Amino acid sequence: MSGAGAPVSPQLNAKGLELVIIAASWHEKVMNGLLDGALRAARDAGIEEPRIVRVPGSFELPVAAARLAPDYDAVVALGVVIRGGTPHFEYVCQAATSGLTEVSVRTGVPVGFGLLTCDNDQQALDRAGLPAAPGFAGSKEDKGYEATSAALETALTLR
């Protein structure tokens, strides 16, 4: 699992920061886990009701982030792309990653990178922050929580 070496995040006090979470719709079960983790991280940092915006897929995350970033202190982009048998995976991953990076650098607003780019469904489930259930041991990582914490910590640093 790639989470080895991750820093221990400090307890954040982001009360008063404006946060928007942009979530793609593909891979509903994984997306629900990512969104739950993002909302938990926001609450843990003192943000009770961040704005949530849904977009069709991960390819649409950058345009939504570009439009919304100027009005917020931090943006979190959540999506899932799972490799298939065509080059589509590489195109979407590259476009979304480059687009989100450009938004953050151009606007100066931190964009939490919660885009899972996985080779298979199991990798996505392992990173989705899902609780244990019958037949499922639970996720090993919570990338929605991590992306939100990173965006908020960076926003506080830049204040």
Curated annotation (Swiss-Prot):
Gene Ontology biological-process annotations: riboflavin biosynthetic process
Functional summary from the UniProt entry: Catalyzes the formation of 6,7-dimethyl-8-ribityllumazine by condensation of 5-amino-6-(D-ribitylamino)uracil with 3,4-dihydroxy-2-butanone 4-phosphate. This is the penultimate step in the biosynthesis of riboflavin.
Superkingdom of source: Bacteria
Annotated catalytic residues: H88
Cellular component terms per the entry's GO annotation: cytosol; riboflavin synthase complex
Family: Belongs to the DMRL synthase family.
Source organism of the structure: Renibacterium salmoninarum (strain ATCC 33209 / DSM 20767 / JCM 11484 / NBRC 15589 / NCIMB 2235)
Cystine residue pairs: none
Residues involved in (2S)-2-hydroxy-3-oxobutyl phosphate binding: G85, T86, R127
Catalytic activity: (2S)-2-hydroxy-3-oxobutyl phosphate + 5-amino-6-(D-ribitylamino)uracil = 6,7-dimethyl-8-(1-D-ribityl)lumazine + phosphate + 2 H2O + H(+)
One of the Pfam families matching this protein, by short name: DMRL_synthase
Protein name as it appears in the record: 6,7-dimethyl-8-ribityllumazine synthase
InterPro entries, sorted: LS, LS/RS, LS/RS_sf
Lineage: Bacteria, Bacillati, Actinomycetota, Actinomycetes, Micrococcales
GO MF terms held by the record: 6,7-dimethyl-8-ribityllumazine synthase activity
Gene3D superfamilies the record matches: Lumazine/riboflavin synthase
Known EC number: 2.5.1.78
Pathway recorded for this protein: Cofactor biosynthesis; riboflavin biosynthesis; riboflavin from 2-hydroxy-3-oxobutyl phosphate and 5-amino-6-(D-ribitylamino)uracil: step 1/2
Binding residue positions for 5-amino-6-(D-ribitylamino)uracil: W26, S58, F59, E60, V80, V81, I82, F113
Keywords for the protein's UniProt record, in alphabetical order: Riboflavin biosynthesis, Transferase
NCBIfam families (alphabetical): lumazine-synth
Enzyme class: transferase
